[in-house]
């Protein structure tokens, strides 16, 4: 880390740590951002030592700028970091990243105008490309330097390891910066495996070449002396054109960037291959119940890079699906953060969710709540179980007969008779009808005890004799004897009305 962090001196490092990441934000650049940028440059086969000077930062910006439109968020972040570092090297006072980008754009516009003015003054307004691999030699001639084996090795290694994952496209764009169609074909021919993907790429290139020929028909008539013929689709693809013709088109006035056109066709075909090698839709990316939030975010953004959609649609997918497809634990935390939360805040809040430590903490909180509720219920039940006692001797509440100070009541407390105690009382409790219940004979007490049975007509009307049924007047003494007053004595004690 020490070698990577040595790109800034003491004073420059102080200025670096005062620049904010976003306008009006609290977070500022730190030393770790330089370390991260150097690692990303190594991943893209770019020398991280270029970060030590302003000229090196300018070269890095020149290679990364064409990839901003089709690149990922990592390339954009890398470009912003290098642009801010360039301003620190140039001693340009900036407050945040946006201001640094504005300064870079302003400086680029000035350099373009200056180059155009210089070309106009010298009588040569041709915009000569200074990008590798077409360079200008000491005699002022534009010559081509073949693509280096190191670049080819980096490209082959990426294809073998990543197998046309979404990060292959920005890697190809960075390695093929300023390349001619011949260099691009060399890069494609070095891919040994994945011939099915290579065949799909060739079909896409043929389709784009046919579309180019349709939109750019050949002009009739001879070509004027000193002028080059217009390139056809096969010329752009490098199959019917020589290296000198390709260099001539790219350095002509006005130039025809056949290398950039061919690279766009290849990137279009690579997008189709990436979509085929990544069949998983972004809608199917869901966080597992025990999956860390960081791994879920990595899978989400990797699949999002393979989606063929505009940046606005991708932003909507990120804002909506990232929270919607999280597991219930993380979803609760993310909804509490609100819709304006940054990705860093989300990952910090969900750190450790789903692991054994988080599960143990949630279980401990749940158990503590259950225990507190149980204690409260037990205390409440204990209070409710305290009933007021009543004395059988005096009938007052607050004490029992054992501790009663009143004169002891004579006789049984149940039946009122003397000679025995309540525990030895053999008299059974009478019900509200005055009967001893349960009755082992007769009808139940709540039924009519003496139901009149239907009788036949008088005997004289049928000639059966003079005897008739029992007159109903004789039933009165029976009815009167159904509820004897003596039975109420066991229920209400000595009834004065019965005496």
Curated annotation (Swiss-Prot):
Region feature (PPIA/CYPA-binding loop): 217-225
Gene3D superfamilies: 1.10.1200.30, 6.10.250.390, Human Immunodeficiency Virus Type 1 Capsid Protein, Immunodeficiency lentiviruses, gag gene matrix protein p17, Single helix bin, Zinc finger, CCHC-type
Zn finger region (CCHC-type): 389-406, 410-427
Annotated stretches, region: Interaction with membrane phosphatidylinositol 4,5-bisphosphate: 73-77
Motif (Nuclear export signal): 16-22
Entry comment on modification after translation: Gag-Pol polyprotein: Specific enzymatic cleavages by the viral protease yield mature proteins. Capsid protein p24 is phosphorylated possibly by host MAPK1; this phosphorylation is necessary for Pin1-mediated virion uncoating.
Post-translational modification Asymmetric dimethylarginine, affected residues: 386, 408
Site (Cleavage): 132-133, 363-364, 376-377, 431-432, 447-448
Assigned protein family: Belongs to the primate lentivirus group gag polyprotein family.
The name this protein goes by in its record: Gag polyprotein
Source species: Human immunodeficiency virus type 1 group M subtype B (isolate OYI) (HIV-1)
């Amino acid at each position: 880390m020490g070698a990577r962090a040595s790109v800034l001196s003491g004073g420059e490092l102080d200025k670096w740590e005062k620049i904010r990441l976003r306008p009006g934000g609290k977070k500022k650049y730190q030393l770790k951002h330089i370390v991260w940028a150097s690692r990303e440059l190594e991943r893209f086969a770019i020398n991280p030592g270029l970060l030590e000077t302003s000229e090196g930062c300018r070269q890095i910006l020149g290679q990364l700028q064409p990839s901003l439109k089709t690149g990922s968020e990592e390339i954009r972040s890398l470009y912003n970091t290098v642009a801010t570092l360039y301003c620190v090297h140039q001693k340009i006072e900036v407050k945040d990243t946006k201001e640094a980008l504005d300064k870079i754009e302003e400086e680029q516009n000035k350099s373009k105008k200056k180059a155009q003015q210089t070309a106009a003054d010298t009588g040569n307004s041709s915009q000569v490309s200074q990008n590798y691999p077409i360079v200008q030699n000491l005699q002022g001639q534009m010559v081509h330097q073949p693509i280096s084996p190191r670049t080819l090795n980096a490209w082959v290694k990426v294809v073998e390891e990543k197998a046309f994952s979404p990060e292959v496209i920005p890697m190809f764009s960075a390695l093929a910066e300023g390349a001619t169609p011949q260099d691009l074909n060399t890069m494609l021919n070095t891919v040994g495996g994945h011939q099915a993907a290579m065949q799909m790429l060739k079909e896409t290139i043929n389709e784009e070449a046919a579309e180019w020929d349709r939109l750019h028909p050949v002009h009739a008539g001879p070509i004027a002396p000193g002028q080059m013929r217009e390139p056809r689709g096969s010329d752009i693809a490098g199959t019917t054109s020589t290296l000198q013709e390709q260099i001539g088109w790219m350095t002509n006035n006005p130039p025809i960037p056949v290398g950039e056109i061919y690279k766009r066709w290849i990137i279009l075909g690579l997008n189709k291959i990436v979509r085929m090698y990544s069949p998983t839709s972004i809608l199917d990316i869901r966080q597992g119940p025990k999956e860390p939030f960081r791994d879920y975010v990595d899978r989400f953004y990797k699949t999002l890079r393979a989606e063929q959609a505009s940046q606005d649609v991708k932003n909507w997918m990120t804002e909506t699906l990232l929270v919607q497809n999280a597991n219930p634990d993380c979803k609760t935390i993310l909804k509490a953060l609100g819709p304006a939360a940054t990705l860093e805040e989300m990952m910090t809040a969900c750190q450790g969710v789903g692991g054994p430590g988080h599960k143990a903490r949630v279980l401990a909180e749940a158990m503590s709540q259950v225990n507190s509720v149980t204690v409260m219920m037990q205390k409440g039940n204990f209070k409710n179980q305290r009933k007021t006692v009543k004395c059988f001797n005096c009938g007052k509440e607050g004490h029992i007969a054992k501790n009663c100070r009143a004169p002891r009541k004579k006789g049984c407390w149940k039946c009122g008779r003397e000679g025995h105690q309540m525990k030895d009382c053999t008299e059974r409790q009478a019900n509200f009808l005055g009967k001893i219940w349960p009755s082992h004979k007769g009808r139940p007490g709540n039924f009519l005890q003496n139901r009149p049975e239907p009788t036949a007509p008088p005997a004289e009307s049928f000639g059966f004799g003079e005897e008739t049924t029992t007159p109903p007047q004789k039933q009165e003494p029976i009815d009167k004897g159904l509820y004897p007053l003596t039975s109420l004595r066991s229920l209400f004690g000595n009834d004065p009305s019965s005496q």
